[in-house]
Amino acid sequence: DYKQSVITEAVTKGLNLDVELVPSGIDWIGDVPKEWEITRVKFYGTIRSGDGISIEKIKDEGTYPVWGGNGLIGYSEKYNESKTSIVIGRVGALCGNVRLLTSPTFVSDNALIFRLSDKVDSKYMLWLLIGADLNRLNTSNAQPLITGTKVKNVFIPLPSLSEQQSIATYLDTKCSEIDSLIAIKQQKIETLKDYKKSVIYEAVTGKMTIGETP
């Protein structure tokens, strides 16, 4: 979709439209700025699975959020990750979804914890993994699943740290604007649906004649 294309374009081409591009040799990346490095995820942090947690310990309210394979699943009174990390859905239809953790959180064994090194900007890496569309790594015909090994070996484009930060700031703003426009459009759609329902109701109950506006 449009938002995904904006993200992928920014993390693979940068913000300077006049920069010289060269082939990366990687399908999802395409051409990249000449000065950028092509590397792998595994060189910029450690990746491990989260931990098991019983359903009884997951509540509707609590101190620490609990993240599973498809997102937030509840709250707990304990956490297993307190560093700046990225949680990656490992199991489920939405496997490959990513979220930046900046406060203590419990990550279940249906997700991966990517603890970042200081060699990469955390927000840039978040946008980079979104652009890489990790869901494509799922090769299971039954339960959707991706592994830490597959994520570690994903090729990524990496500019300088300052350029990473500029791209991350741009995408924070741009994607917030896109989300706002989507929300406004969705609200208009819901309003039209409600209007349609009212017209149908008025017509079938005889409260409105043909050609009359409700």
Question: Which role fits each region the language model picked out?
Answer:
Residues P23-G52, K57-G68, Q165:
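Non-catalytic DNA-recognition/assembly elements of restriction-modification systems
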Residues S54-I58, L137-A142, A183:
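A short, aromatic/hydrophobic, helix- or strand-capping loop or linear motif
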Residues S24-D27, D109-L112, T149-N153, S176, ...:
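Positions in alpha-helical segments
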Residues G30-I38, L112-D121, N135-R136, T149-D172, ...:
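Proline-centric
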Residues G68-L72, S76-N135, T139-K152:
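A short beta-sheet element
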Residues D1-E20, L158-P214:
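Amphipathic alpha-helical coiled-coil/heptad-repeat segments
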